[in-house]
Every structure is written in C-alpha cells, then in structure tokens.
Amino acid sequence: MSNIRPLHDRVVIRRVEEETKTAGGILLPGSAAEKPSQGEVIAVGNGQITDNGVRALDVKVGDKVLFGTYAGTTVKVNGEELLIMKESDILAVLEG
C-alpha cells in the first residue's frame, strides 16, 4: 500500500490489469494493448469544498471503479504506478 493522501475530491486508483488477448486468442504486445480503464480505489480525499461546506465522496477505499481511458494523472509512488483523478472522472462503481 502506498502512503499517499489525495486532497479534496480526488481519489487514488490502482489499475486492474485486463486480459491482453483478443477474443480470438491472439496475444497483444504491451504497446498494442490499451491501458485498463478499471481499477481499485486505494485512497480518497476529504471531499469537495462547496459553498455549503464539504460534500463527502461517494466512493470509498476498496471500491472497483470504471473510468475513461484518458482520465486522471499517472504518478509513480514507491515504484508503483497509480492514477490520481477527481471523483467526477469516475464513470461507475462495479458492484458484486
């Protein structure tokens, strides 16, 4: 686990590796495979600051989420590649 605390309405996500094979069973080289667009939330900020105070985030640590291919900023912390993005960049939470 990385020691990182995002600010405000930002979350830190660890990408979940997706299968690098096509439906036909062809193995894709790393350069041809798209970066995964799902991951696990590993840290959340305190919330979005609004005129009415602070609004807590809807996602929590451990949630599996979907996000756009180009969402967030990639950072390297302790040798681990992580994504930092605003909660609004998260498209959905995977349940079940």
Curated annotation (Swiss-Prot):
Its main location: cytoplasm. GO terms for biological process: chaperone cofactor-dependent protein refolding. It is found in: Cytoplasm. GO terms for molecular function: ATP binding; metal ion binding; protein folding chaperone; protein-folding chaperone binding; unfolded protein binding. One of its GO terms (cellular component) is cytoplasm. Keywords: Chaperone, Cytoplasm. InterPro entries: Chaperonin_GroES (IPR020818), Chaperonin_GroES_sf (IPR037124), Chaprnonin_Cpn10_CS (IPR018369), GroES-like_sf (IPR011032). SMART domains: Cpn10. Belongs to the GroES chaperonin family. Heptamer of 7 subunits arranged in a ring. Interacts with the chaperonin GroEL. Together with the chaperonin GroEL, plays an essential role in assisting protein folding. The GroEL-GroES system forms a nano-cage that allows encapsulation of the non-native substrate proteins and provides a physical environment optimized to promote and accelerate protein folding. GroES binds to the apical surface of the GroEL ring, thereby capping the opening of the GroEL channel. This is Co-chaperonin GroES. It comes from Acinetobacter baumannii (strain ATCC 17978 / DSM 105126 / CIP 53.77 / LMG 1025 / NCDC KC755 / 5377).
